[in-house]
Amino acid sequence: MGQDHSVEARPPPTHEEVVRHLAGKFADKCYTPLEIYSLKDNFKSLADTVQDVKYLKEDTVARFLEIPDALRVTPVLFQSVSFLAAFPFLRDAPAVLGLEQLVIAITILTGRWKRVLKSPADRTKLLFKSLAVYDRKLSCATLTPVASPMAAEAKGASAGFAVDEAGDDDEAEDDGDDDLVLAAFESLDCVDAFRHGDAPPKIQGAMIPADNFVRLIMLLLLVAPLDPQERLSQYSDRLVGTELEDLHATAQCVVQAFLDVEEVPGLTWSRFRKILPVCCPFMFDAGFNALFSHFLFSKNIDFNKRKPTGSEEDRGEQPKLPQKATPSQSTLPQPLLPQAGSILNANILSQLSFFIPGDSLFRCLRLLYSGDEDGFSMGSFESKVFNWRAPTLLLVRGRRLDDHPDGTRESAFAASIPPRRFPNGGGGGTTENSDEIITFGAFIAQPWRHTHRECFGDDSSVLFQLGPVHDVFRASTMNRDYAGFVKPTGSGSSNHHGGIMFGCPAPSPSKASSATGALVALGSVSLFLDSSFEFGVFTHDHTSRGGAYAGSTSRPRNFQERFAVNCLEVWGCGGDEESKRQAERWAWEAREAEARRKINLGTGDLEADRALLEMAGLVGQNRSGGSMI
């Protein structure tokens, strides 16, 4: 006792040791041996070598992933990859893309880091930093690619993107320590390195340039339906002519949710983190996961190769290692949609997958109703949609109306709803731009039914706008007026103009007026289509509370859109089983209708026959025995 024992302090690990340890941990915990073998094989075949250092160049990564030149997104994507490859030492970004750095970047981009890093944080902040530049003069900002390991080494340990000194930027908030980076150091038992100077750079002053963000959204729309073993080149038909123009237009609608490209040069962190979880929570998930999983499938290994015989082994022939088979270049992918719609196409489908899980959309939709084909009537809508027992997706597109009604029918619609109080929602130009095409929709998980005193739907319902501004209105818990289908009634205590409504209260006999001029009650955040499917109105009363749908995160203001309906369609979400059930119900109803037509009362007395049918509830009381058109 009393004798001092000198304990030699262990020196802190170097950056290289930390990166090697983290990459090894990711490889062991996040991948199968087969996937790591394929990743190493792909890296070996793709890497360039400078002074015994193997690394991947920008054009090599783009060529392997088949990134289209038409999108001009390769520099943006490689900036993100090389930044994430520097994890957890983000101050050293951009990193040379060696094997260990590639493992780290792919682990983050595919979301597999969750198997190792136990942190409540997500990768949102990392993704923003990987796409942002720190130059206030964004018009002059350029991305500086890493040409080689020697060039990166010459730039010093603090090499990366140009960073200005902190100034009086609007983005003055201190984002604090990055939880994901801290979790990485904790998993390696070297938290002191994080606390003593290796913390990631601050977000203050960072922006994603608007042009870069548009190109990135175009890529994400393209890769959204991609399967890990599908070739991106299989979707090349979406990159020519009008298809490319439509892809760009769809991307512009999504970008409008984050920023007005005519007003601001780039996207800030505060705006990014505010909008992304509400309007585009799945934007980076499915597409990036599948795209960067391509590195985990090697083309040099054939899973279908037979095991060599003993004579082959005697001749020294090496067997091929088993691997998941990569798809043949001649294999045609299953179409994303079984048929084209008037509104829904591949780009709109990808846009929907940004906030509705893609598993419910891609190769799972069936066109139930189309106004162009089935007629714009509630009777036709009911006969086509009500038998679908799975979730449905309603889309409506129309032309924005002027403030002053034009014609008797438009005037009648304006007289059926409360007077306009709010300006237009804006989007594709000035807020007063009439004749602009606008698109709304709703996702309803419950089957459709008639609405008498209670609406249908649940808290998974979503109301949304797709153009000219992408916006999402999540279900609220304040009330349950999620969806309604009300046929018009011209008299009585339950008088209602009728129509399809989302976020509007159900008809209430105690409050309804018997006068034919009663107004439709519009919810604070609501979409209403009149009974003729000729006009519609979307209302966003930001000052009110208690609606069935939450207000806009992107546009916290009052606005209203009145429009003339051009297209209306409903898609059923589900597979062959749901289609089979619907077909069976249609067949049963057809048999019942045929049986009703063949009823032979045999009395010869028309008045007595009619009285008997009225007692059965088949005619009379505003019933005609068929659908009301």
From Swiss-Prot:
Low complexity composition bias: residue spans: 326-336
Keywords for the protein's UniProt record, in alphabetical order: Cytoplasm
Biological process annotations from GO: response to oxidative stress
Location of the protein in the cell: Cytoplasm
Residue ranges of every copy of the TLDc domain listed in the record: 342-574
Region spans: Disordered: 307-336, 406-431
UniProt entry tagged with the keyword Cytoplasm: yes
Amino acid composition bias (Basic and acidic residues), ranges on this chain: 307-318
Pfam families named in the record: TLD
Gene Ontology CC: cytoplasm; nucleus
Family under the similarity heading: Belongs to the RTC5 family.
Function, as annotated: May be involved in a process influencing telomere capping.
Protein name, UniProt field: Restriction of telomere capping protein 5
Species: Pyricularia oryzae (strain 70-15 / ATCC MYA-4617 / FGSC 8958) (Rice blast fungus)
Organism ancestry: Eukaryota, Fungi, Dikarya, Ascomycota, Pezizomycotina
